[in-house]
């Protein structure tokens, strides 16, 4: 069970009837928002008697009063409530592109590096589209195409950094032939396998304990014909 870190209902003006936005609206990354979201997540978990996942969204607007880094916000949410995080890699790239990041892949990778690996329970991938108008180009998380190259790059980095995670390729509109869907799933498998193989030596070098040294007088002896090979 999972849901997005967002809100969808709000009054247009103070005192007016609450309306539904029919979209995922971004929350402010502040202490107040963290308190509200933590309370709501805990209420759902108490009702369901299980931890739930909370997903980062693609945000086309931001809040001027943000005071917390997004990754830090999610880390603290997970620490407070025991929820797990659903990391949407496509949303990271979409947000970086719309923010005008000089290097969108590096910006998305920085989020991955800041998130606690133990909190991440699942990863999402998807395609995006670009819409150009009078005011410029907007990147839309529309789940209507193949996964783009920058998203694959960040996914490989995420697997190397976070370890193997269940991964879902989302494709909701303009559905292609089934073979193409399977191809995207295979690509995710291959990239994950390659990333884990590259990461494994680094992890082993960092984590492997030094061989224990046994004083000569304490070394075990074995009957003839028995021993360690």
Language-model region placement:
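Active-site-proximal loop/turn and secondary-structure-junction residues that shape catalytic pockets
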Residues: 5-9, 58-60, 91-93, 127-131, ...
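Short acidic, Gly/Ser-rich segments with clustered Asp/Glu that frequently serve as metal-coordination loops
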Residues: 84-86, 90-95
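C-terminal helical cap(s) of enzyme catalytic domains, especially alpha/beta-barrels
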Residues: 178-205
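Conserved, mostly hydrophobic/aromatic
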Residues: 1, 52, 88, 123, ...
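Gly/Pro-rich active-site loop or hairpin
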Residues: 31-34, 95-162
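Conserved active-site loop/cleft motifs that coordinate metal ions or position small ligands
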Residues: 166-172
């Amino acid at each position: 069970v999972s849901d997005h870190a967002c809100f969808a209902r709000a009054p247009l003006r103070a005192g007016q009837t609450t309306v539904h936005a029919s979209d995922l609206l971004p929350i402010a990354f502040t202490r107040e928002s963290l308190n509200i979201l933590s309370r709501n997540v805990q209420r759902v978990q108490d009702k369901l008697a299980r931890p739930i996942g909370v997903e980062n969204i693609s945000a086309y607007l931001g809040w001027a009063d943000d005071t917390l880094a997004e990754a830090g916000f999610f880390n603290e949410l997970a620490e407070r409530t025991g929820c797990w995080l659903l990391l949407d890699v496509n949303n990271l790239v979409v947000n970086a592109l719309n923010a005008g990041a000089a290097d969108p892949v590096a910006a998305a990778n920085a989020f991955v590096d800041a998130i606690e690996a133990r909190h991440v329970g699942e990863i999402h991938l998807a395609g995006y589209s670009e819409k150009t108008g009078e005011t410029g180009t907007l990147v839309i998380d529309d789940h209507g195409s193949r996964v783009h190259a920058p998203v694959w790059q960040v996914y490989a980095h995420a697997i190397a950094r976070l370890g193997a995670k269940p991964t879902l390729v989302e494709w909701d509109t303009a559905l292609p032939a089934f073979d193409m869907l399977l191809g995207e799933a295979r690509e995710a498998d291959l990239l994950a396998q390659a990333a884990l193989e590259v990461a494994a030596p680094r992890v082993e070098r960092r984590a492997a304990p030094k061989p224990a040294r046994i004083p000569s007088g304490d070394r075990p002896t074995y009957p003839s014909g028995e021993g360690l090979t």
